[in-house]
Amino acid sequence: MNRLYLKGCGTALVTPFTDDYKVDYKAYAASVDRQVESGVHFLVPLATTGETPTLSAREKTELLRITRERVGGMPLLAGCGTNSLDGTLANMELLEPFGPDAWLVVVPYYNKPTQEGQYRYFRAVAERSTLPIVIYNVPGRTGANMEASTAIRLAEDCPNIIGIKEASGRYDQVSELIRRAPEGFSVLSGDDDMTLALMATGGQGVISVASNVAPAEVSAMCDALLKDDLKTARTLHHRLFPLFKGCFAESNPVPVKAAMARLGLMTGKVRLPLSEATASTVELMNKIIDDLWKSA
């Protein structure tokens, strides 16, 4: 079997809600179709941007079923990580029948594991998984950073750990990862505004929030970077940069949902404990969207 190799733009899909906070499956299906038509390289349902902690088991399986049904052979990287081994394995068992190609597994949050604890946890997950795994390092949300040496150790010791989504915001750490990563191991940006730098250094792509809004443009930037066309990539980066920053004006996915609402693709509703975008964020995202489409 060929090893899965992730590269380019993977969209971390938002989960649309109706005005009464039910999952809007129709809007979700339309959003998935828009992603496919826009040329993204892979999709990432059930991750942070999808508000997965607020979803029921039935909602998770239905969202994954819809995604698989609509994307054909496009790779699906499904979020399944928790802060316990048993919880993560239970999510894998729940979701695997619905067709993911690989798992996105976050560094356990709240527990604050040491580097050795992180290594043992991911090795245990890898040994029990029938699908490839991408590590998700996002210390701003988890309270624990996976150092480059730990990620490389896992990449070398666990053949089915195939990549890492790196959202530490530390360029030195990302550079070390890229420099030492074994062949076929994908280093993916977890921050849209770091994608240009990460891919120019040798990384393979991005798991993007902004591509919910501008999938064709973010994909084109990644395509340019994969071809070492820095001139085109820089132009796209600068055009998209206000969107990259605006998507984090409040906790993700609050601003990106405001942007999607501006485009008429879904409501801006989020589930508690998140709250809808403030008036100032709505105004900001409206301006960003209007300016972005004016410059198209």
Please identify what each model-predicted range represents:
Residues 2-143, 153:
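Active-site beta->alpha loop and helix N-cap motifs at the rims of alpha/beta catalytic domains
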Residues 9, 48-51, 80-82, 164, ...:
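Gly/Ser/Thr-rich helix-start
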Residues 23, 36, 197-296:
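Structured C-terminal cap/extension of enzyme domains
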Residues 28, 60, 64, 88, ...:
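A general structural signal for well-ordered alpha-helical segments in protein cores
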Residues 127-128, 141-248:
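Catalytic alpha/beta core domains of metabolic enzymes, predominantly
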Residues 137-138, 160-161, 271-272:
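Glycine-rich phosphate-binding "P-loop"
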Residues 138, 167, 259:
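Short, well-ordered beta-to-alpha junction loops that form the rim of enzyme active sites
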